[in-house]
Design a protein with these regions (language model features):
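N-terminal Sec-pathway targeting helices
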Residues: 5-19
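Predominantly soluble domains enriched in secretory-pathway, periplasmic, or organellar proteins
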Residues: 23-337
Length: 337
């Protein structure tokens, strides 16, 4: 009997041990699975270059039509605009424009594209349905930046050496008026609020224009340390971001107050924002990288190596695809996650 009880006891202990081992192994497997899933989710947040698209000589400007998923790139020395299909990420057409095309902006509601021609002092107007230039609009000297208000169909161009902003009627495609400012370069227009923001490159300030009211916001008292190249506005947070030489200035538009800047990079030029995700994208032409910055914390999330001299960056908010203009590589980096 004692031997039977002993064997029975041993069997029970063995069974318990087997069960415990099974529980431990199951737990470890579960942990590994969770870790694996977490790793997969983390990878989804990591961006990478999915394709590099060859375009014309010295591309400098880019605009995306999210309604048609078509991307337009200005090729400064080729005097052309490359048309890219966002589905295939391939060039479908090349359009001849004026001398030295630089800035470009598309109205998704009318499917009209506007191009600044830096050396011929004109704006080329392209019909997005036919991709044919339908008009050339004379403006002041050396137009560079351009953006538009899609709701009232008003187009704004920065004329660098003329120290002016041309305001154009997008229906008649004629200049309505011209506003004075100081060495304007980058520009961002918000269609919902009607605000126009301009980076005055040599004056260390930003102009804000709404209606006929022009204000200037000084972003630094050290004019030799920074140079405002570009601006981008997040209407949901009411914050304006300014790409400078080695930092991004942050302005609270509700009070026009300067907040803590974002220290990043060496020479920031390209700048864009996805207001829906509150993510900021900035290009550094010295380090040849794109910085992805969390708009809620102003911390750098990712740093992506791209082509040579990334002068501009744009995002399609519908597909969350990022397009980077590599000026010296004559290419576009397509970044996805």
């Amino acid at each position: 009997m004692e031997h039977k009880n002993l064997r029975s006891t041993r069997r029970r202990y063995a069974l318990i041990l087997i069960i415990l081992v099974g529980i431990i192994l199951t737990s470890l497997a579960l942990i590994n699975t969770i870790g694996s899933d977490s790793s997969k989710n983390q990878l989804k947040d990591n961006h990478f270059i999915s394709k590099t698209i060859s375009v014309g000589s010295f591309p400098v400007g880019i605009s995306v039509n999210p309604s048609t998923n078509v991307i337009y790139v200005t090729n400064n020395q080729s005097d052309t605009v490359s048309v890219i299909d966002g589905k295939t990420n391939s060039v479908t057409k090349t359009i001849k424009v004026g001398d030295g095309p630089a800035g470009i902006s598309v109205n998704p509601l009318t499917d009209m594209i506007y191009v600044t021609n830096y050396y011929s002092d004109t704006i080329s107007v392209i019909d997005g349905k036919t991709h044919v230039v339908v008009k050339e609009i004379p403006v002041d000297s050396t137009p560079w930046g351009i953006d538009l208000n899609s709701e009232n169909n008003i187009v704004y161009t920065t004329n660098y050496f003329a120290n002016t902003i041309s305001i154009i009627d997008g229906i008649e495609n004629n200049v309505i008026t011209t506003v004075k400012t100081d060495k304007p370069w980058g520009i961002d227009v918000n269609s919902h609020t009607g605000h126009v923001f301009v980076a005055n490159r040599d004056s260390v300030n930003v102009s804000t224009l709404k209606g006929d009211v022009m204000e200037k916001i000084a972003i630094s008292d050290t004019p030799f340390k920074i140079s405002p190249n570009n601006v981008s506005y997040n209407e949901k947070t009411n914050l304006l971001y300014v790409a400078n030489s080695s930092l991004i200035s942050v302005i609270d538009i509700s009070t026009n107050s300067i907040l803590e800047p974002i220290s990043v990079g060496m020479n920031l030029v390209g700048l864009t924002i996805n207001s829906d995700t509150n993510m900021i994208y900035a290009s550094d032409i010295q380090n040849d990288v794109i910085y992805i910055i969390d708009g809620s914390t102003h911390m750098i999330k990712e740093e992506i190596k791209v082509g040579d001299h990334p002068i501009a960056v744009e995002i399609n908010p519908e597909t969350n695809t990022i397009y980077v203009v590599n000026e010296y590589s004559n290419s576009i980096s397509v970044i996805i996650s």
